């Protein structure tokens, strides 16, 4: 059980690395928290520091999700765990996302979790990620509003998990991740309702 606790904590800390803030500060000298929406995610980084820095942030946020899950998959293949592998990896995924969304390094105010969620599920439920990506790119044909596409990805992934009959632990994990993503987009949802979102 000790290995589970340690890897969950390390995964949370990995997710907590405020990549958008650090990269933007290093490459442009801008504190992304003081510009645009104030969010450290790649969408706001693009707004305040340009496409190149935003793309670097996006890649790093995705890797932040992939790497802990990959390492924990390797651990699960070598060590007998007190819980199922699906349960273990699902807990790791939620830890990474929570770390990103509520990073202790920035007063528990992190990003909105889209890229890190996609990265975390990339190895755990690749078909669900693919379904989310398809929905995202289809919606690009109809809207430029990033929050609509992001929320749609979050909703699509648990639906895909259910449709694909993935293990219940992974499906529940996807539902929780979707809930966190929607929660982090609550201000965007309010603006959408008021027709103020851009």
Swiss-Prot record:
GO molecular function: acyl-phosphate glycerol-3-phosphate acyltransferase activity
Taxonomic superkingdom: Bacteria
Transmembrane segments: 2-22, 55-75, 88-108, 118-138, 162-182
Keywords per UniProt: Cell membrane, Lipid biosynthesis, Lipid metabolism, Membrane, Phospholipid biosynthesis, Phospholipid metabolism, Transferase, Transmembrane, Transmembrane helix
Cellular localisation: Cell membrane
Catalytic activity: an acyl phosphate + sn-glycerol 3-phosphate = a 1-acyl-sn-glycero-3-phosphate + phosphate
E.C. no: 2.3.1.275
Pathway involvement of the protein, from the record: Lipid metabolism; phospholipid metabolism
Any single Gene Ontology cellular-component annotation: plasma membrane
One Gene Ontology term from the biological process aspect of the record: phospholipid biosynthetic process
Membrane topology classification: Multi-pass membrane protein
InterPro entries referenced in this protein's UniProt entry, alphabetically: G3P_acylTferase_PlsY (IPR003811)
Its biological purpose: Catalyzes the transfer of an acyl group from acyl-phosphate (acyl-PO(4)) to glycerol-3-phosphate (G3P) to form lysophosphatidic acid (LPA). This enzyme utilizes acyl-phosphate as fatty acyl donor, but not acyl-CoA or acyl-ACP.
NCBIfam families: glycerol-3-phosphate 1-O-acyltransferase PlsY
Subunit and partners: Probably interacts with PlsX.
Family the UniProt entry places it in: Belongs to the PlsY family.
UniProt-recorded name of the protein: Glycerol-3-phosphate acyltransferase
Organism: Clostridium acetobutylicum (strain ATCC 824 / DSM 792 / JCM 1419 / IAM 19013 / LMG 5710 / NBRC 13948 / NRRL B-527 / VKM B-1787 / 2291 / W)
Gene: plsY
């Amino acid at each position: 059980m000790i290995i589970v606790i340690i890897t969950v904590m390390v995964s949370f800390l990995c997710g907590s690395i405020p990549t958008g803030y650090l990269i933007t500060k290093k490459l442009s000298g801008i504190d992304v928290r003081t510009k645009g929406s104030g969010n450290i995610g790649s969408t706001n980084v693009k707004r305040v520091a340009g496409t190149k820095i935003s793309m670097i942030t996006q890649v790093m946020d995705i890797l932040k999700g992939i790497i802990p899950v990959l390492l924990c998959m390797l651990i699960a293949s070598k060590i007998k765990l007190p819980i199922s592998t699906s349960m273990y990896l699902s807990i790791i995924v939620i830890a990474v996302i929570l770390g990103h969304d509520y990073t202790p390094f920035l007063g528990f105010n992190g990003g909105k979790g889209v890229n890190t969620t996609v990265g975390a599920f990339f190895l755990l439920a690749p078909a669900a990620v693919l379904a989310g990506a398809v929905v995202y790119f289809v919606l690009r044909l109809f809207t430029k509003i990033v929050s609509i596409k992001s929320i749609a990805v979050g909703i699509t992934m648990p639906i895909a998990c259910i449709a694909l009959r993935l293990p219940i632990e992974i499906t529940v994990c996807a539902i929780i991740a979707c809930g966190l993503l929607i929660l982090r987009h609550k201000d965007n949802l309010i603006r959408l309702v008021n027709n103020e979102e851009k």
